[in-house]
């Protein structure tokens, strides 16, 4: 995900602190598309599972069974991504879940590209969500995106010049998930053609 540790320090510290809290809590994370929300939510789940807690990650973009969201209150951590895409039935289910966790220790973290006030959801749900702790994820600049991709590439033992990324941002996309998936494609092609990933190589493969 497109996520800046430095810029989002307060949010990370707040979430870290929730792991030692005994009461339920609701956090609303907003930010632009491809801005690291998914990365953050999945990070919460990994950490919770690492502490032997019951945790579930749900992406509203994917088709979900009916009466699913309102059955999650026995989980310690529930992370729900893309709640700006909730159907009306799911909005009611999330509202029910919100009310149920008042009696539990569940930590509910939800994400959307808008702030609670801008969501087109049921009035009661909007009211509840505006009571959540609301954080806006800060957008990364190009250099921070490049640093983040470079860290990911080190895990894959891929050494690509920063200039190649800057070029991709300019001619291809600034969306991190799109750039990462095209790098996968370039990596496979470079292995197949035994050629390093350079700007001329990118031009050839992407026919730019």
Annotate each predicted stretch with a short phrase.
Residues 71-93, 97, 104-112:
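Conserved P-loop NTPase "ATPase switch" module shared by AAA+ and STAND
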Residues 172-186:
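The conserved phosphate-sensing helix
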Residues 1-12:
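Dynamic helix-loop-helix/coil hinge segments at AAA+ ATPase domain boundaries and subdomain interfaces
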Residues 159-172:
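Short conserved motifs of the RecA-like P-loop NTPase core
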Residues 132, 146-159:
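Conserved AAA+ ATPase "sensor/coupling" helix adjacent to the nucleotide-binding pocket
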């Amino acid at each position: 995900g497109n996520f800046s540790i430095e810029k989002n320090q307060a949010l990370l510290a707040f979430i870290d602190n929730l792991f030692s809290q005994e009461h339920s809590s609701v956090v609303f994370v907003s930010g632009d598309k491809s801005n690291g929300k998914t990365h953050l939510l999945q990070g919460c789940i990994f950490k919770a599972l690492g502490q032997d807690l019951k945790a579930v990650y749900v992406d509203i973009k994917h088709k979900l069974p009916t009466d699913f969201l309102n059955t999650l209150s026995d989980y310690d951590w529930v992370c729900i991504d893309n709640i700006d895409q909730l159907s009306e039935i799911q909005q009611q289910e999330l509202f029910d879940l919100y009310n149920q966790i008042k009696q539990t220790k569940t930590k509910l973290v939800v994400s959307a590209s808008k702030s609670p006030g801008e969501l087109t959801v049921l009035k009661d749900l909007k009211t509840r969500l505006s009571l959540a702790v609301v954080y806006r994820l800060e957008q990364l600049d190009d250099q921070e995106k490049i640093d983040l991709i470079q860290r990911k590439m080190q895990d894959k033992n891929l050494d690509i010049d920063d200039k190649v990324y800057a070029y991709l941002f300019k001619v291809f996309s600034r969306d991190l998930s799109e750039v990462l998936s095209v790098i996968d494609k370039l990596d496979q092609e470079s292995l197949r053609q035994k050629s390093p990933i350079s700007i001329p190589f990118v031009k050839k493969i992407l026919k730019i």
